[in-house]
């Protein structure tokens, strides 16, 4: 596994050198930053709801969005979705997620084949027995015809059973057989690599192929992607399938992908969270961004540092202020990205008492140290490491919010450009 040193923040890390793939103009792999992507859960045939969700995911920061293409009505809707998104200013690459009949849908709906930026193929259900290679080849040939990349996405829940049985039988005949888990991992890796080799034999370039091998257990994911990284230089899409809901899904995905990313493995990621009923689908985008930003690999939104609180901070003022600023940042980022280039590098500190408050506030671009329990009701504010004022009275929170807004305007806004 070859590597090079890449620095996206101030933290260099060894990056596995993969072959870059252009997905609708977004580069995945090579020396490009790790890309964040997501997937809709709407009925793709419902153009209005799908456009609305893709737009929301794109506004949240998803750089690629995958949609289900499972029947004729879905395939027929794809060009309409693409056109509507472009009219709304959302030029985000759309990936078609195909299972079972992808070869037929792409052939019957050429406008869909053209509108999509990438095709996702699952080797485990692209076809069965004597039809398998033919139907796989049909999709690959369609990708060649329309000059589209493909993701060969193996999933342990739909693993090629013929390949798995062959490897299990071969393993059983060995003198010191491997565990069933090890054989399954090998089958997943082989399924991806065999399919990639077949695609290349058909004529698809390596710069048009992305691989993924999704499982639902953290240790399996780490093992499988480590094997893939050692045995190929294809661009890799990371994702823990069926990660689950809430904190469990966030922790499991972050644990697995954090380890792989730290080793330089992974060119694009998706955090597959099960949303709560009526929940916000954009949550998975936010978690993916926060994972990459927390690890120091990319910058997406200003960082808000806040202390966890203790017996010195019985007041909730600092918690409420930190939450307000964080929500304000998330809400305004789509506009700020255009209006204030570089604002994602901003750091804000909202601290709750005198112990660590002043020190942490000095390290941030702009920070405030609110009074803890029994402390003088005043709050020193630090800008670029220097104390600039002390806020007092019931309007401390509102005053600091205005100072943050002014700082952003002065540092990243038009006035700064004119002055320079």
UniProtKB/Swiss-Prot annotation:
Residues at which [4Fe-4S] cluster binds:
307, 310, 353, 360
Q: Which cofactor does it need?
A: [4Fe-4S] cluster
Biochemical pathway: Isoprenoid biosynthesis; isopentenyl diphosphate biosynthesis via DXP pathway; isopentenyl diphosphate from 1-deoxy-D-xylulose 5-phosphate: step 5/6
Superkingdom of this protein's organism = Bacteria
* Keyword Metal-binding in record: yes
> Cofactor stoichiometry and binding?
Binds 1 [4Fe-4S] cluster.
**4Fe-4S among the record's keywords?**
yes
Provide any one GO MF term from the record: 4-hydroxy-3-methylbut-2-enyl-diphosphate synthase activity (flavodoxin)
Which Cys residues form disulphide pairs?
Answer: none
Report the catalytic activity: (2E)-4-hydroxy-3-methylbut-2-enyl diphosphate + oxidized [flavodoxin] + H2O + 2 H(+) = 2-C-methyl-D-erythritol 2,4-cyclic diphosphate + reduced [flavodoxin]
Gene3D superfamilies according to UniProt: Dihydropteroate synthase-like (3.20.20.20), Sulfite Reductase Hemoprotein, domain 1 (3.30.413.10)
Q: Which InterPro entries match?
A: Dihydropteroate_synth-like_sf (IPR011005), IspG_bac (IPR016425), IspG_bac-typ (IPR004588), NO2/SO3_Rdtase_4Fe4S_sf (IPR045854)
A single Gene Ontology biological process assigned to it is: isopentenyl diphosphate biosynthetic process, methylerythritol 4-phosphate pathway
EC nos: 1.17.7.3
UniProt keywords, alphabetically: 4Fe-4S, Iron, Iron-sulfur, Isoprene biosynthesis, Metal-binding, Oxidoreductase
- Entry-linked HAMAP family: IspG
The UniProt function text for this chain reads: Converts 2C-methyl-D-erythritol 2,4-cyclodiphosphate (ME-2,4cPP) into 1-hydroxy-2-methyl-2-(E)-butenyl 4-diphosphate.
Q: Which family does it belong to?
A: Belongs to the IspG family.
What name appears for this protein in its UniProt entry?
4-hydroxy-3-methylbut-2-en-1-yl diphosphate synthase (flavodoxin)
Q: Which organism is it from?
A: Brucella melitensis biotype 2 (strain ATCC 23457)
Q: Lineage of the native species?
A: Bacteria, Pseudomonadati, Pseudomonadota, Alphaproteobacteria, Hyphomicrobiales
